[in-house]
Curated annotation (Swiss-Prot):
Organism listed in the record: Synechococcus sp. (strain CC9605)
InterPro entries, per database record: UPF0367 (IPR020885)
Name used for this protein in its record: UPF0367 protein Syncc9605_2376
Protein family according to the UniProt entry: Belongs to the UPF0367 family.
Length: 110
């Protein structure tokens, strides 16, 4: 989903506070035997970090067996995962100005 700000002729800088207000934090999970990752979003960095740590602990301990995740950005989006099928989890910031940028991680595309 792309979020477009007001149009105008001013240039955007990385330290522009208007970029920070539109940022969302994506928690992305790679699943065994699935080419498509599962992702949910959080509006606050602290909430995203807490969820990341919760998933990480579940991977270490194998408990709980099932984990239900909800998305703050898309209301009503829910997914329940079998923790033993989660291979990796990553947390990254997605800013509105970076709508066409590549996802973090490794990619064979140029």
């Amino acid at each position: 989903m792309r979020i477009f700000g007001p149009t105008g002729c001013r240039s955007l800088r990385e330290d522009d506070p208007s970029l920070l207000s539109n940022a969302v934090y994506v928690i992305e999970l790679a699943l065994r035997m699935s080419p498509v990752p599962v992702s949910v979003q959080r509006k606050e960095h602290s909430d995203a970090e807490a969820l990341y740590q919760q998933i990480r602990q579940a991977l270490e301990n194998g408990q709980p067996r099932l984990m239900e995740l909800t998305c703050e950005k898309v209301e009503g989006k829910k997914v329940t995962l079998l923790v033993s099928e989660v291979l990796a989890v990553q947390l990254y910031e997605k800013a509105a100005a970076a709508g066409g940028s590549k996802r973090p991680g490794f990619s064979f595309d140029s």
